[in-house]
Swiss-Prot record:
Expressed in liver and heart, with low levels in skeletal muscle. Acts as a glycogen-targeting subunit for PP1. PP1 is involved in glycogen metabolism and contributes to the activation of glycogen synthase leading to an increase in glycogen synthesis. GO terms for biological process: glycogen metabolic process; positive regulation of glycogen biosynthetic process; regulation of glycogen biosynthetic process; regulation of glycogen catabolic process. Residues 28-89 are annotated as: Disordered. Keywords: Carbohydrate metabolism, Glycogen metabolism, Phosphoprotein. The keyword tRNA-binding does not apply. Residues 51-65 have a biased composition (Basic residues). The keyword Phosphoprotein applies. The lineage of its organism: Eukaryota, Metazoa, Chordata, Craniata, Vertebrata. The CBM21 domain is known to be involved in the localization to glycogen and is characteristic of some regulatory subunit of phosphatase complexes. Residues 154-259 form the CBM21 domain. The gene is Ppp1r3e. A motif (PP1-binding motif) lies at residues 87-90. This is Protein phosphatase 1 regulatory subunit 3E. One of its GO terms (molecular function) is protein phosphatase 1 binding.
């Protein structure tokens, strides 16, 4: 019994080959963008260009990989290693000038951008201490105060129970006096003052200086204060305590103010801690 020879193109296929074809068909259906790798079919005289591509054997083929999760065609940033060489480009290599020359004329000031001026001013101010704020009451300050010579002084004294009589700022300090109504034998008079616009304050007692001319019936108290600060003013108010009550004279809420010298060594200047005490 003769067996017919199978046709030349009818090549028996094993299970591994069929499984590889099935796998490639599955990946091609899921990701059509993946390109098949063509393999040249060898012939008798060598390779034939344009031959039909054949599927790879799983052991020799290249398995498809999933596309990046960030989206198709997205390139991930390449990290540089410490050994990566960096390139430096100078402006002249790009057709630019290496230096910019600017000419300034004495009669034409340079044009500095606004943001540069602000930065320069900010840097310059950091080297200086903050300026002290303008002392309160400086615009109303005087070298000498004499309320007793003003009209209506007796009426004010009768209403307030205490009034400033006079105050003078000298090179050794402030000398002043006050009048208080004689409401009782025991009475206490003091002066509350500040040299920094009431950010801090002190209180100095006044001493009895004898009876004051009538009317009305009153007593006189004298006080001493330090000299006003240079370029500032000394603010003060009078306090009167008698029979458990308290009365104030603060110049109608504006405080009394004595002006200090404009420059060190000027009129009215004194040592910072210069005090004059008397009994």
């Amino acid at each position: 019994m003769s067996h017919e020879r199978p046709p030349r193109n009818d090549i028996p296929r094993n299970l591994s080959f069929i499984a590889a074809l099935t796998e490639r068909a599955y990946y091609r259906s899921q990701r059509p963008s993946l390109e098949e790798e063509s393999e040249e079919e060898p012939g008798e005289g060598g390779t034939r260009p344009g031959a039909r591509s054949r599927a790879h054997v799983p052991g020799r083929g290249r398995r498809a990989r999933s596309a990046p999760a960030g989206g198709g065609g997205a390139r991930t940033a390449r990290s540089r290693s410490p050994d990566t060489r960096k390139r430096v480009r100078f402006p002249d290599a790009l057709g630019l000038e290496l230096a910019v020359v600017r000419r300034f004329r004495p009669g034409e000031p340079p044009r500095v951008p606004r943001h540069v001026q602000v930065q320069l001013q900010r840097d310059a101010l950091r080297h200086f201490a903050p300026c002290p704020p303008r002392t309160r009451g400086l615009q109303d300050a005087r070298i000498a105060l004499e309320p007793a010579l003003e009209p209506g002084f007796a009426a004010r004294l009768q209403a307030q129970r205490i009034c400033l009589e006079r105050a003078d700022a000298g090179p050794l300090g402030v000398a002043g006096s006050a009048r208080v109504l004689d409401l009782a034998y025991e009475k206490r008079v003091s002066v509350r003052w500040s040299a920094d616009g009431w950010r801090s304050l002190r209180e100095s007692p006044a001493s009895y200086a004898g009876p004051a001319p009538a009317p009305p019936r009153a007593d006189r108290f004298a006080f001493r204060l330090p000299a006003p600060p240079v370029g500032g003013a000394l603010l003060f108010a009078l306090r009167y305590r008698v029979t458990g009550r308290e009365f104030w004279d603060n110049n109608g809420g504006r405080d009394y103010a004595l002006l200090g010298p404009e420059h060190p060594g000027g009129a009215g200047a004194a040592e910072p801690q210069g005090w004059i005490h008397f009994i």
